């Protein structure tokens, strides 16, 4: 049994909603257990959770937000996701119908690059003995499936969080340097104005002596 994170990227948004509706009624089997799932869409560069379900909870649809899936969604929608995916993302058309098992450092980058504006995806936390079961579920639609061991995905998340902190630190340092330069220029401007004012005063006094 392997615990996996599965990202199913859809070419057609309506199919993503249909698939998620069917997924919420998913009949659990030993060979493919689904714990949590969230449907996300990308609009104007923002990652928006549209629907979610948690088979491990009696209520609280948002229970996924504090776990691995929530972290993945947050990172994909954050500065690291933007850096990994570029400005527009890449169309998934040529990859439709494929299922890719990814190694370390690959899930976030691949998902970010394939999520372009207007696209949708379903992210699942599953335990699988037979990966073909969920592949078959999603390949009824025009999808690309990305799969990664959940532990490896968690390691990616932790690395991305550290990277985000470093990006924030560097941005803050750059901002402080910019403000320091602006304040220095402002002070210099005041000094020059003071020098000009003093010179003018003494020039007037000198003129009276002529």
Report residues per predicted region.
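Short, low-complexity, glycine-enriched hydrophobic/amphipathic alpha-helices that associate
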Residues: 56-102
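Amphipathic, membrane-inserting segments
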Residues: 114-176
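Short cationic amphipathic helices and targeting signals
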Residues: 4-11, 120-126
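A generic local secondary-structure boundary/capping motif
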Residues: 26-28, 110-113, 134-135
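Membrane-engaging insertion elements
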Residues: 87-126
């Amino acid at each position: 049994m392997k615990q996996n994170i599965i990202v199913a990227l859809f070419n057609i948004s309506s199919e993503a909603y249909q698939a998620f509706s069917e997924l919420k009624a998913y009949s659990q089997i030993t060979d493919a257990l689904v714990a949590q799932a969230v449907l996300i869409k990308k609009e104007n560069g923002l990652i928006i959770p549209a629907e979610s379900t948690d088979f491990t909870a009696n209520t609280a649809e948002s229970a996924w937000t504090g776990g691995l899936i929530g972290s993945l969604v947050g990172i994909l929608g954050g500065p690291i996701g933007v850096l990994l995916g570029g400005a527009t993302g890449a169309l998934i058309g040529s990859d439709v119908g494929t299922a890719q098992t990814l190694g370390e450092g690959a899930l976030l980058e691949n998902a970010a690059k394939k999520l372009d504006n207007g696209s949708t995806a379903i992210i699942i936390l599953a335990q699988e003995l037979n990966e073909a079961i969920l592949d078959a579920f999603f390949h009824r639609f025009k999808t690309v499936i990305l799969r990664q061991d959940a532990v490896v995905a968690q390691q990616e998340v932790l690395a991305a969080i550290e990277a985000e902190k470093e990006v924030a630190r560097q941005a803050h340092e750059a901002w402080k340097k910019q403000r320091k330069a602006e304040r220095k220029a402002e002070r210099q401007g005041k000094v020059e104005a003071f020098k000009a004012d003093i010179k003018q005063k003494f020039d007037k006094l000198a003129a009276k002596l002529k």
